[in-house]
Amino acid sequence: MRILFISILIVLMSVKVRAQKTKIIYVGDPLCSWCYGFAPEIAMVKEHFDSLHFQVVIGGLRPYNTETMADLGDFLKEHWEAVEGRSKQPFNYGIIEDKTFVYDTEPPARAVIVMRELNRKAEFEFFKEVQHLFYVENKNTNDVKVYLPLLEKYEVDPEEFENTFESSWAKMEVKKDFQLAQQMNISGFPALLLDHEGKLYVVCKGYAKADAIIGAIEKVVGQ
């Protein structure tokens, strides 16, 4: 898990991409602790630029990992404390005491992909709910059943969600997001990019405050 302590990077990278409407691209992972800390900031950015297209890319923090909290607990606790101290987001450390819990970030990432398929407009809100499930409620995010109580508000059928989650399609689709993040040379999360007038700008890598991000984007798009 790479942690980048930077407040804002304005146009770190500018590469040619296919021209399209201006778009904010958020690269993160539901089980990334800095992404959880970043959640209120990116929500404010999204709300401020509500006229711009907003795309979520699941980066893949530790997909297919087989290590348990017995292996990673001390390491994770140190990072969670740092995130909590900086972001003031609430953390429940109880799950670290479950030494049998396998810290595999692929299932919650896949759950977000399934929501994208079944109700795209709800994807970002669901992403944040998955973060809350893990970091506050300490739910087992490897189990599809923990997501089902969330679905009614999004008008998603639980059986359809579960079947899609277990499908080979979903398992392949989440890999596409991981690969897309790699193609954009993003290996640390969170990261925020801006696709504007045929160029792709890296706005920030790592945790940053909303006001700094908003100012950086406005300098590029001229708002």
Question: Model-found features: residue ranges?
Answer:
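Bacterial Sec-dependent N-terminal signal peptides
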Residues: 1-21
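A structure-centric signal for secondary-structure junctions around beta-strands
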Residues: 21, 108, 188-189
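C-terminal cap of thioredoxin/glutaredoxin-like
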Residues: 27, 38-47, 132-223
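Cys/His-enriched microdomains
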Residues: 30
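Cys/His/Pro-rich metal-binding microdomains
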Residues: 33
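Structural alpha/beta surface segment adjacent to cysteine/selenocysteine redox centers
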Residues: 36-134, 138, 143
